[in-house]
Design a protein with these regions (language model features):
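Structured alpha-helical bundle/scaffold domains in large eukaryotic membrane-trafficking regulators
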Residues: 33-40, 167, 200-207
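Long amphipathic alpha-helical segments with strong coiled-coil/leucine-zipper propensity
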Residues: 50-138
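Alpha-helical oligomerization segments
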Residues: 180-227
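Conserved binding-pocket/active-site segment within a compact domain
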Residues: 125-200
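Short, mixed-charge aromatic SLiMs
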Residues: 45-55, 119-128, 207-223
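Leu/Val/Ala/Ile-rich N-terminal alpha-helices, chiefly Sec-type signal peptides and the beginnings
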Residues: 1-77
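Short, solvent-exposed segments of well-ordered alpha helices
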Residues: 5-19, 58, 79-83, 87-90, ...
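A structural signal for well-ordered alpha-helices, especially hydrophobic packing surfaces
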Residues: 22-25, 29-32, 100-107, 121-124, ...
Length: 227
């Protein structure tokens, strides 16, 4: 990847990637409990998987404002007051970082993931009206989620560590919800790859808690004051 644009520095881009992982984790929790999640936040979390020719972080996350949930989640996870309320989200986030490490140890699995992702187009926002075109687009979305979920099961699920998702049994057993959860986990691992490329390391999550929390807040302010 080439140097990123000048809007943010490397440390900030590293935390944007971390926010993308946390957003995937937050949406996994939401889906597991409610069976639904906002479409724009889902797309912002998943499409980085499908950006194969990217030269900058903002090529991977073209609408950084759609990562606002992840940035807010990072602020809460690293807050002494609110961190305890986000135990599942923190666990999913750390789990995706661990799975990145295990994926990095298998070149064959990396090649399989890369080859299969190359045949899948990025998701587009669908106006969920009742007309026939919207129905067809939503069916296409469902097929994409199924493809990505199958890829997760064929690869990441074979690794020695597995993320145990907590939620309502009826949602976890729902095929469409389960497909979206697996897709989000795969999307989070992709962002974990970028986080690592930008210098992210798990030990820094312990020693730089306050700085990470402050950076996430600063990025959110930059995004919404420059919009």
């Amino acid at each position: 990847m080439n140097n990123t644009a000048d809007r943010f520095n490397r440390w900030e881009y590293q935390n944007i990637a971390l926010a993308a992982i946390a957003q995937c984790a937050s949406l996994v929790k939401t889906l597991a409990i409610t069976g639904k999640a906002p479409q724009n936040e889902m797309i912002a979390s998943i499409n980085p998987l499908l950006m194969v020719d990217s030269n900058s972080v903002e090529d991977i996350y073209p609408r950084l404002s759609d990562l606002s949930l992840g940035l807010l989640t990072i602020q809460e996870i690293f807050s002494n007051d609110r961190g305890r309320k986000n135990v599942d989200i923190a666990r999913y986030t750390l789990g995706m970082l661990l799975l990145r490490n295990k994926l990095a140890a298998s070149q064959q699995m990396q090649d399989t993931v890369r080859q299969r992702l190359a045949g899948i187009n990025p998701l587009e926002f669908v106006d969920e009206t009742a007309d026939e075109q919207a129905k067809r687009q939503l069916m296409y979305q469902d097929r994409t989620f199924e493809q990505l979920a199958n890829l997760y099961q064929d690869t990441i699920s074979k690794l020695s560590y597995r993320i145990q998702v907590q939620g309502k049994l009826e949602n976890l057993k729902n095929e469409n919800v389960a497909n979206r959860i697996r897709t989000l986990l795969l999307g989070g691992i992709r962002s974990a790859v970028l986080w690592y490329q930008l210098g992210g390391r798990r030990w820094r999550l312990v020693f730089y808690r306050k700085r990470i929390q402050g950076t996430a807040g600063s990025i959110r302010r930059k995004l919404f004051t420059s919009a």
